[in-house]
């Protein structure tokens, strides 16, 4: 007896959701084709290079198509010591990566500007190579998180532009 009621409730919920005009963000017409036509400009640094790679992956950039949008970014990276050992050496760092970006239509028009911040922590190692590897790993994780946040922001902004 309970199972038919649950099925009927689920069916009516889906019917109401379809009736309200709900469109999945990545459904047709969606924003995925638009995201893949955004060219990315980053600062000429190692972190900038990693951000370009991460953004091109997140946006699924299609090199075979002409870019409709241009994304310009500016990076601010701050590293802060968090913990100290009894011998007053740092045991952990916090890395804060702030990416300010501007999305502009190639054909001209109003730009979309915003910023995202990604915060990660990593352990400070005693060996020099391990310390460098830990810092780079932290930078890569921060860049990946910033690229994901930018994709989400751009998806939302472009979906709002496509609304009638």
Question: How would you label these PLM feature ranges?
Answer:
Residues 21-24:
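Bacterial signal peptide processing site
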Residues 162-164:
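Short, solvent-exposed mixed-charge patches
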Residues 32-42, 127-130:
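Acidic/histidine-rich, surface-exposed loop or edge segments in extracytoplasmic proteins
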Residues 62-68, 72-115, 120-137, 141, ...:
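Surface-exposed short loop/turn segments
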Residues 15-19:
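C-terminal motif of bacterial Sec signal peptides marking the signal peptidase cleavage site
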Residues 41-72:
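Post-signal-peptide N-terminal segment of Sec-exported extracytoplasmic proteins
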Residues 1-9:
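Bacterial N-terminal signal peptides that target proteins for export
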Residues 56, 60, 147, 151-159:
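Sec-exported extracytoplasmic/periplasmic mature domains
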